[in-house]
Curated annotation (Swiss-Prot):
InterPro entries: DNase_II (IPR004947). Disulfide bonds join C22-C161, C269-C349, C310-C329. Keywords: Apoptosis, Developmental protein, Disulfide bond, Endonuclease, Glycoprotein, Hydrolase, Lysosome, Nuclease, Signal. This is Deoxyribonuclease-2-alpha. Belongs to the DNase II family. It comes from Sus scrofa. It is found in: Lysosome. Hydrolyzes DNA under acidic conditions with a preference for double-stranded DNA. Plays a major role in the clearance of nucleic acids generated through apoptosis, hence preventing autoinflammation. Necessary for proper fetal development and for definitive erythropoiesis in fetal liver and bone marrow, where it degrades nuclear DNA expelled from erythroid precursor cells.
């Protein structure tokens, strides 16, 4: 295999000074993107077998595209977006949180904290919020470079990155006081600490102590796209999807989540809106790929009749009814048209009405 010259590699990794934003697979700033890391055996090929293959989506991609190489690469959307973490961070603020953090500063898996994973990275003009499902990710800022954890290669994962102006981070930081994240690395100094007191509270491990136990806020991206953030704390005491989200969005939901944990909640059709557990995922085209939900650690849901799509960090199980976490939703046509066809089959309710056929393929 031919190697890249140092000059070419430097050009590929170049990030403009003062431009903290999500970067797409093409290397250009984007308002938002979604990366769907595929399960290791989802399709043939060396990259696929090693669990480093992914699909990429943004506003201009025209649907899902094959990722630009390996998800472990610093030149792809994830690596390029997170690159400032592993360079000079003197002018930045950041927060890395994960209920299963990398081994750093003695951090341990903490089941009393929120089941929530993400990155906030910002400068004086704005930055991005990355919400994901990946354990042990990303590496702390003291690491030599971006990398993908070997522990996250086997199963599917989802990550959504949205670029926001600085003004939106006050609402974002307040949402984190509900989700009670395990922060394993951060930098919050000077003006950032003064502008975002909620982030200081989050870093100290503080969280909401009185009702309401959930919060929904509208966030506006740098390009003006509208996102709805849903956050709950453990005292909410109910499933995020059937206990709140379906009613809030006014729609049935098909939910993909990790189905190898204990206490899985079955599909729920007790309310006006039905919440159905996805059992099979299939990407379009003859090459697929397609796989079972038991091979997929991602967390997302889609409304089959209305253009809502949400990507987050919570499962549907009994334990997580009593843990913090959330999801980020939008009515973006590009997002909905990409996610809706992924649902190949779902678990029906025991007495489900026939609006959805038992375990049947999704209808066009």
């Amino acid at each position: 295999m031919a190697t890249l010259s140092p000059l070419l590699l430097a050009a590929l990794l170049w990030v403009p000074v003062g431009t903290l934003t999500c970067y797409g697979d093409s290397g250009q700033p984007v308002d938002w993107f979604v990366v769907y890391k595929l399960p290791a055996h989802s399709s043939p090929g060396d990259v696929a077998q090693s669990g480093l293959r992914y699909k990429y989506l943004d506003e201009e991609s025209g649907g899902w595209r094959d990722g630009a190489g390996s998800i472990n690469s610093s030149t792809g959307a994830l690596g390029r977006s997170l690159l400032p973490l592993y360079r000079n961070t003197s002018q930045l603020a950041f927060l890395l949180y994960n209920d299963q953090p990398p081994k750093y500063r003695g951090s341990q898996h903490s089941s009393n904290r929120g089941h929530t994973k993400g990155v906030l990275l910002l400068d004086q003009e704005g930055g991005f919020w990355l919400i994901h499902s990946v354990p042990n990710f990303p590496p702390p800022s003291s690491s030599a470079a971006y990398s993908w954890p070997p522990s996250a290669r086997t199963y599917g994962q989802t990550l959504i990155c949205v670029s926001f102006p600085l003004t939106q981070f006050l609402n974002i930081s307040r949402q984190l006081t509900y989700t009670y994240p395990m922060v394993y690395d951060y930098k919050l100094e000077g003006d950032f600490a003064r502008k975002f007191p909620y982030l200081e509270e989050v870093v100290k491990g503080h969280h909401v102590l009185q009702e309401p136990w959930n919060s929904s806020v509208t966030l506006t991206s740098k390009a003006g796209a509208s996102f709805q953030s849903f956050a709950k704390c453990g005292n909410f005491g109910d499933d995020l999807y059937s206990g709140w989200l379906a009613e809030a969005l006014g729609s049935n939901l098909q939910v993909q989540f990790w189905q190898r944990s204990a206490g899985i909640l079955p599909s729920n059709c007790s309310g006006v809106q039905h919440v159905l557990d996805v059992t099979q995922i299939a990407f379009p085209g003859p090459a697929g790929p397609n796989f079972n939900a038991t091979e997929d650690h991602s967390k997302w849901c889609v409304a089959p009749e209305r253009p809502w799509t949400c990507v987050g960090d919570m499962n549907r199980n009994k334990r997580e009814e009593h843990r913090g976490g959330g999801t980020l939703c939008a009515q973006l046509p590009a997002l909905w048209k990409a996610f809706k066809p992924l649902v190949k089959a779902w678990e029906p309710c025991e007495k489900e009405n026939r609006a959805f056929s038992p375990r049947s393929p999704a209808k066009d």
